[in-house]
A protein has these predicted regions:
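Compact soluble domain cores
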Residues: 91-141
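Long, contiguous N-terminal structural blocks used for assembly/anchoring
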Residues: 1-113
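Acidic, proline/glycine-rich low-complexity IDRs
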Residues: 2-29, 122-178
Length: 178
């Protein structure tokens, strides 16, 4: 049985310029903002934490989380602009729900300083915030992927735009979850 000292001896340091973070190999990472200083939740599946190259990729992607969030927002805007885009209907539904279906008081809270009824769906994308960033193994692809949750305001709505990135920092899937 592992003692506390054994666990402390087995701690690994995440290779990140952004945060000073230690983790235990083979244990899931799930942290809140107050634990890391990051402005979002951070999580990594346990099967990745004992793989140094996978964790190096986590550190690199974590250092670029906001840049990747901007890339995700650009992809959402592109999907909104092109009715033939694969995710057009999905992202349109997400935007329509938050502007037209939540009620005017909630919409006003989601989009402060605006008249939500006059906002275009593309303008709404700029209000999305990074809520969570993590990494897991996609069993269909049999590879490590990165997952990002974007939300208008997690204290008001639990609806998310979930963006999946591959190891090359390319988006391969956009979903809507709650």
């Amino acid at each position: 049985m592992l003692t506390l000292q054994d666990k402390e001896d087995s701690l690994m340091k995440l290779n990140s310029k952004r945060i000073d973070f230690e983790y235990t190999p083979s244990e899931e990472i799930f942290t809140f903002s107050e634990d890391t200083g990051l402005p979002f939740l951070f999580d990594v599946d346990e099967e990745l934490t004992d793989n140094p190259s996978a964790m190096d990729a986590v550190g690199e992607m974590l250092d670029e989380a906001e840049t990747l969030a901007e890339k995700a927002k650009a992809a959402i805007k592109a999907a909104l602009s092109d009715q033939g885009a694969p995710y057009h209907d999905l992202v349109t539904f997400f935007m329509q729900f938050h502007r037209d279906d939540v009620g005017s008081d909630i919409a006003a809270d989601l989009f402060p300083g605006t008249d939500p009824a006059k906002l275009s769906f593309i303008e709404m994308v700029d209000f999305l915030r990074l809520k969570r960033f993590g990494s897991l193994v996609d069993y269909k692809m049999d590879q490590q992927v990165f997952i990002m949750d974007l939300s208008f305001n997690p204290e008001i709505t639990d609806e998310l735009m979930v963006i999946y990135f591959d190891l090359k920092k390319e988006i391969f899937c956009i979903t809507h979850e709650s």
